[in-house]
Amino acid sequence: MVLVTGATGILGRVLVLELLKKGKKVRAAKRKSSNIEEVKKSWLFYTADAERLFEQIEWVDVDLWDLDSLRAALDGVEEVYHASAKVSFHPKDAQEMLRTNVEGTKNMLYIAEEKQVKKFLFVSSIAVLDEVNENGIIDENSQFNPKEEHSGYAQSKYLAEMEVWRSSAEGMNTIIINPGVIIGTGNWGNSSGELFTTFEKNSFTFSGGTAYVDVRDVAK
């Protein structure tokens, strides 16, 4: 059994789909307020077999601060894909991001260790990587530089990574990935999908650049 957190998010929903296509049994964690029908609708952009695959999902409501809720969600689970996160670059959301991204991850790891999960994959972000290589590119060897200024989101993801590294040092099999801005189909009004409508309505240019990645590439 595989548990995917943030299963209704831009990455989580496609990750669930890819795992099901590989024949995995998937338990998908969501909030009580999540709209799973919207997830199924978005799958129509990715597969012609959306209805059949969607019926195979075991949905479970999870509260990252309720340890009993996490124990129930992780019961019988061998692999965890922790894609749940609060994403914001507004200062007012800094404390909420610390609570969700750091404390929530810490709780997930605690119960995963208790349940002897065999693999824990944490979805971090390119936002925590600062140092570039000799070609001026951020790569797998790039590190977080605490002397540089960072957004509250980047700080929360870095601190969450430290919790994952702690679990790794204690013997858990962990993986951290750091994707760029994830772009997906079928979520035009949410998450990074808003970029398309924003650029369409307000044509402008800006200096510099950033890293974008197709959600299907991240999920695979």
Feature roles, as predicted:
Residues 24-35:
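Conserved glycine-rich Rossmann-like NAD(P)H-binding loop of the short-chain dehydrogenase/reductase
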Residues 2-22:
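N-terminal Rossmann NAD(P)H-binding glycine-rich loop of SDR-like oxidoreductase domains
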